[in-house]
């Protein structure tokens, strides 16, 4: 019996030693796991910080893109306004041309009447008051023609003023388009930096991977919107160039019509002087 008890005691002691060794191993494993957990939590915290930084960069890029789109829209609106002004200017120009043609016709009629009056003047000197009325009528026609010509000149001056205003508006639109292009270049650089930062992130958890995919999708969307804004800005610039050509053409036509008016005005003054000498 003593031998059995001694053997049992030795077995119990051996088990106690084994359990103590196992407990120490478990404690070491626990410490190792705890250390790994702390490292993992530190990595997650760093990743979260990088994600927050990317979010701020994305928000700033979105704000700048919205500002660029707004400026492009404003530029397009200015181009549309200038188009309407050019159209109104063309209408005024056409009306002035029509009045000038009418003035030329009346001047021709007055000149013909003056020539006829000159041919008949010597034979009509002894006639009654009807001859004086005829002369007064001719003078009234000449005065009316001169008034119409002066009105046409005022219309030309107004057209020239509107052309000057349109040129100023075109210069402002071009300046704003240049500013928009500069902002677009800056935004492209910022988007490129954001894209590089996104690629350098090391996301070990599924949630971080999902966030990265979401940010990449947002960047693609921003890039697409940026391309659209660039296209709109380019289109607005083409419209400005087209309008500038139209303004140049109208200025040339206006100059030609003014020269024509000066010639007609000279003829009108000569005719009026001849009629006055009667």
UniProtKB/Swiss-Prot annotation:
Location of region: Disordered: 92-134
Coiled-coil annotated spans: 1-270
Keywords from the named record: Coiled coil, Repeat
Keyword ATP-binding in annotation: no
InterPro entries, per database record: Tropomyosin (IPR000533)
One Pfam family per UniProt: Tropomyosin
Record's function text: Tropomyosin, in association with the troponin complex, plays a central role in the calcium dependent regulation of muscle contraction.
Record's protein name: Tropomyosin A
Source organism (scientific name): Echinococcus granulosus
Lineage: Eukaryota, Metazoa, Spiralia, Lophotrochozoa, Platyhelminthes
């Amino acid at each position: 019996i003593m031998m059995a008890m001694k053997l049992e005691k030795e077995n119990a002691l051996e088990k106690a030693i084994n359990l103590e060794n196992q407990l120490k191993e478990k404690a070491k494993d626990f410490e190792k796991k705890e250390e790994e957990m702390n490292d993992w939590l530190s990595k997650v915290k760093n990743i979260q910080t990088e994600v927050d930084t990317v979010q701020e960069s994305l928000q700033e890029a979105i704000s700048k893109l919205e500002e660029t789109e707004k400026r492009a829209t404003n530029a397009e609106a200015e181009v549309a306004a200038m188009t309407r002004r050019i159209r109104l200017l063309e209408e005024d120009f056409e009306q002035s041309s029509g009045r000038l043609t009418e003035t030329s016709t009346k001047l021709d009629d007055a000149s013909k009447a003056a020539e006829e009056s000159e041919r008949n003047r010597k034979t009509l000197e002894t006639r009654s008051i009807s001859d004086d009325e005829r002369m007064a009528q001719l003078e009234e026609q000449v005065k009316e023609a001169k008034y119409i010509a002066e009105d046409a000149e005022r219309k030309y001056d107004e057209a020239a003023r509107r052309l000057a205003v349109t040129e100023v508006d075109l210069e402002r639109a071009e300046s704003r388009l240049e500013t928009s292009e500069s902002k677009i270049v800056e935004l492209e650089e910022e988007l490129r930096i954001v894209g590089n930062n996104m690629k350098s992130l090391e996301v070990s958890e599924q949630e971080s991977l999902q966030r990265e995919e979401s940010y990449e999708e947002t960047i693609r969307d921003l890039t697409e919107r940026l391309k659209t804004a660039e296209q709109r800005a380019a289109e607005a610039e083409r419209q400005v160039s087209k309008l500038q050509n139209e303004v140049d053409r109208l200025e040339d036509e206006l100059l030609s019509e003014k020269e024509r008016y000066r010639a007609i005005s000279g003829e009108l003054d000569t005719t009026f002087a001849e009629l006055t000498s009667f």
